[in-house]
Amino acid sequence: MNGNISAYRNKITALPATVAANGTFGGNGVESVIGHPNGAQVGYVADGIFKSQAEIDNHATQEGAGLGRIRWRDLDGNGVINEKDQQWIYDPTPAFSYGLNIYLEYKNFDLTMFWQGVQGVDVISDLKKETDLWSGLNIGFLNKGKRVLDAWSPTNPDSDIPALSRDDVNNEKRVSTYFVENGSFLKLRNLQIGYNVPQNFAKKMKMERLRLYLSAQNLLTIKSKDFTGVDPENPNYGYPIPLNLTFGINVSF
């Protein structure tokens, strides 16, 4: 058995003078600013759902506010929700990564496992735009996730999923903490079980060694219970990481 653990940190320390004055905007909230990690994002802070008219009346002026709509936090306290109510909300750098190799033998059997994990990492779960927001990407042939069945409504007032709406009047697809989730995971990257056929039997078949094995890749994923997607390693629209099963034979003559 052997394992490893590693960690790294990154921070932008210098930019061209013409860029450093304002930072660079890479789209989707990504900004390059001295003193902050590369790939970090700014955005709005989602502060729950408006569940009563009193909550709306007592909140800062927010365009699109309504029952069942996401409430944005008034960070500067000026009583109006605008672009100044943004802060750093996302850092793609994990706290640490780790791995564990295990090899076991018992009589003619052997077992190999490789576990790999990432801890303390943020992910942007863009798929929530399809699982939580009916307006989503507004593409007619796309299905919606089953989470929309639990959306806020007068008969489901305890839900934290926005009310169904065809129009995104509250701009709920904006970059915000609503889409930032815990992307920590532990994966069984490789599992192999082997059997060495007894040598006297192998020699009867004119072989020095005969081994049969069954292996699987990406067999198991352990993730945070707070992650709403399928795979925190692939939280958006990428092709799913496949499960591979292989049966093989090793022969020596």
For each of these PLM feature ranges, what is it?
Residues 1, 96, 107-109, 184, ...:
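Outer-envelope beta-barrel architecture signal
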Residues 1-3, 113, 212-214, 249:
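Membrane-embedded beta-strand positions of outer-membrane beta-barrel proteins
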Residues 1-92, 132, 151:
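Conserved small-residue
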Residues 2, 99-101, 190-194, 246-248:
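Membrane-embedded beta-strand positions in outer-membrane beta-barrel channels/transporters
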Residues 5-11, 106-108, 117-121, 190, ...:
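Transmembrane beta-strands of outer-membrane beta-barrel pores
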Residues 10-30, 120-150, 222-229:
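Outer-membrane beta-barrel and related beta-rich outer-membrane complex signature
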Residues 23-51, 146-159, 173, 219-253:
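C-terminal beta-signal and terminal closure region of outer-membrane beta-barrel proteins
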Residues 118-212:
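Extracytoplasmic gating/loop element in the C-terminal half of outer-membrane beta-barrel translocons
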